[in-house]
Design a protein with these regions (language model features):
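Switch/communication elements of ASCE P-loop NTPase nucleotide-binding domains
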Residues: 1-115
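Acidic, divalent-metal-binding catalytic cores of TOPRIM
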Residues: 73, 82-270
Length: 270
């Protein structure tokens, strides 16, 4: 059936999709083994392939595929993901991830996209609250002489401070080294809220003190500007051309901690 689709399709990868579509509606009891199915396909096709593989499995087939495409990874089904790693002497290991709780599955499905799923393919990750930190940390890496992409480091925007504990759990289950950067949101001019103190304590407990970099009281405070209006743009302008000696110390510390974690893992390219 797939061979017939290959003969009619304009390109091999389009043929792969057409052939699998036909199989998903008619075939059961078959083992499919596919290497790097994402090659030469647009990101939209990656997401569609993931759903197509699910349809095949629901008909009683088994689907095995290798991938370096975050769009093909489903963090809502961690128990279906097997991580293949290689140590410094070339020994390969395969580890199946433990599933996450049902309540968290829904949250992960909502919060993760292909970019966030890159953390599964990373040597290390920096977990940050939002867009401001995500767009400015690469400038800190650059000013210190590093490129996070070259180092295979993912800067993961967690969609808010309250989601950071969930991302910590995902990193731990995937055995991805990580560093957390978050605001304390505790200001001397006002009484600290119990909720903020509890969240800060939860993050510190889950991540560990050595993996946690707290910005006092927030990003604006350590970067030297005030106000929330257009914060990402202002932060970008503030740090885009900063020299090493002008960088905020907490951000430098976060970058150096992440680099140290990343360099403990074997890179997939050099």
């Amino acid at each position: 059936m797939i061979q017939a689709a290959l003969a009619r399709a304009p390109a091999p990868r389009v043929a792969l999709i057409r052939g699998l579509e036909a199989c998903a509606s008619e075939i059961s009891g078959v083992v499919f083994a596919i290497e790097e199915p994402e090659l030469f396909l647009a990101p939209h096709a990656h997401r569609y392939l993931r759903r197509l593989f699910r349809r095949l499995a629901e008909r009683g087939n088994q689907v095995f595929f290798t991938t370096h495409a975050p769009g093909l990874l489903s963090v809502a089904a961690l128990d279906e993901v097997n991580l293949v790693t290689r140590d410094e002497i070339g020994v390969t290991a395969v580890e199946r991830l433990r599933p996450i709780d049902v309540d968290d599955s829904f949250r992960v499905m909502c919060e993760f996209d292909a970019e966030r799923s890159e953390l599964f393919l990373s040597r290390a990750a920096v977990l940050v609250e939002g867009l401001t930190e995500k767009i400015t940390l690469p400038f800190v890496f650059s000013a210190l002489g590093y490129d996070p992409d070259r180092e295979q480091i993912s800067i993961v925007e967690c969609g808010g401070k309250s989601n950071i504990p969930l991302f910590i759990e995902i990193c731990r289950r995937a055995r991805v080294p990580f560093v957390v950067v978050h605001d304390s949101d505790l200001r001397p001019e006002r009484e600290p809220s119990e909720a903020e103190q509890k969240l800060n304590a939860l993050i510190r407990r889950k991540a560990g003190a050595r993996r946690t970099v707290v910005l006092e009281p927030d990003f604006e405070g350590i970067a030297g500007f005030r106000g929330k209006k257009k914060k990402p743009e202002r932060a970008w302008l503030h740090l885009a051309n900063a020299r090493p000696e002008e960088l905020p110390e907490p951000l430098v510390r976060a970058v150096r901690l992440t680099l140290a974690s990343a360099h403990q893992r074997e890179p997939s390219y050099s």
